[in-house]
Amino acid sequence: MKLSNLTLFSFILLSFYDVQSDEVIFNDAKSDLELESPYIDVIYDKDKVSEICPKYSIGCYLSKDGGYILISDEIPSNHHDVVLYGLYSDYLQHNNSGLIDEALTCDLKVNYLSENKKHELARLYSGQCDSLFRNKVIVMN
């Protein structure tokens, strides 16, 4: 019985830690963007991600039902915070302007990693940002 109670207590404590850390990441994104919006839930479910989010993505922000974020429960731990930070950034931009600036989100993620002393990941994400958004000419018809 004691082992069962200890296991339950540990599970509750870990669940609280996850929610707490998600809220800290949300507050970091709010502060960096200088935008206000209410906190939205994060659902960790790889099956829902593969069903709802864009193909090959690890997560996405959805605006329906007041907004929420889906993230795979199999996300590598070293990418969790920056992916969640990016999705919160998308939410904050969309909730305040109706638009999402993907280049801004990309740059914010690189800065977030650098500020948190994750320089190797920052270089990886910076290279990805450069390949996706830099030196591109946008032609509008």
Language-model segments: residues:
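Metalloprotease/metallohydrolase-associated module, dominated by Zn2+-dependent proteases
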Residues: 25, 29-32, 97-141
